[in-house]
Amino acid sequence: MRAEQGDILRVSGINWPVIVVSNNHFNAIGEVIVCPILKNIPGNAVHLPIRAITPSGEIEGHIACEHVRHLDLNERRYTKVYSLQMTDYLDISDTLIALFDFR
């Protein structure tokens, strides 16, 4: 199973879910760029709310878009728990682009 953009993962050694933000071309090598989904942070311009009902329970919190991390999934166990629709992913994508908008 390969992780894809918009997937919410549970990864061994990480206590919170993460969302895959890297594109599928990059993800094909087994590495991903992710942002954490955290419960105890306030919403703001870079903390986007998320609520997903999964077979294993509910994921609710904020995506911390400023906490971008690289993970090598070839070296970690992980489980895909949910996949966002592309329309739901657009706010995340827009926020990440805005963080790196060089002028």
How should each PLM-predicted stretch be described?
Residues 1-103:
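Conserved functional hotspots at enzyme active or ligand-binding sites that engage polyanionic ligands
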